[in-house]
């Protein structure tokens, strides 16, 4: 509420509902969305809860160890994730559909030190598709309209 006193156009929300009961989370998220419509506020939502992300966002940026790996409109990211980390992340969301069993992607490999990361893709040590090129810095590239991915193999992995 204090953040709204100055009529901001941009608010950073860092895990704003993580410690709240699910029913309270929904009320807070709905209030934030109403305020966004009424006041034209833009939010940067930082969270690990992909259900919250899906509910409140228009666009999503996925980061791995501080490195942006994918950004896309929300609906497209959930229906067609392209980066291997995003695919693994979304596979971890529990499904409520008992007729559609979702295959969970289990990540293996060693975590890169966030204190002293190597150049290149920070996900490479855990990525099942890593190749030599992954040791080089990866630029975000637009692979679909408005959908950017930081992966040198995205075109060939898109069909997997």
Across the structure, where does each feature detected by a protein language model lie?
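P-loop NTP-binding/switch modules centered on Walker-like glycine-rich loops
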Residues: 12-16, 20, 24-102
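Charged, flexible cofactor/metal-binding loops and thiol motifs
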Residues: 73-160
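Conserved catalytic motifs of ABC-family nucleotide-binding domains
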Residues: 7
């Amino acid at each position: 509420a204090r953040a709204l006193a100055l009529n901001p156009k941009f608010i950073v929300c860092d895990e704003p509902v993580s410690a709240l009961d699910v029913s309270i989370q929904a009320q807070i998220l709905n209030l934030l969305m109403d305020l966004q419509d009424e006041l034209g506020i833009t939010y940067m939502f930082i969270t690990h809860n992909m259900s919250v992300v899906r509910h409140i966002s228009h666009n999503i940026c996925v980061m791995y160890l501080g490195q942006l790996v994918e950004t896309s409109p929300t609906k497209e990211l959930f229906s067609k994730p392209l980066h291997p980390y995003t695919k693994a992340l979304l596979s971890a969301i529990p499904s409520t559909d008992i007729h559609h069993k979702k295959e969970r992607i289990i990540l293996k490999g060693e975590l890169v030190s966030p204190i002293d990361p190597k150049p290149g893709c920070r996900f490479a040590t855990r990525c099942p598709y890593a190749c030599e090129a992954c040791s080089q810095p990866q630029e975000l590239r637009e692979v679909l309209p408005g959908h950017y991915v930081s992966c040198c193999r995205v075109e060939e992995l898109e069909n997997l």
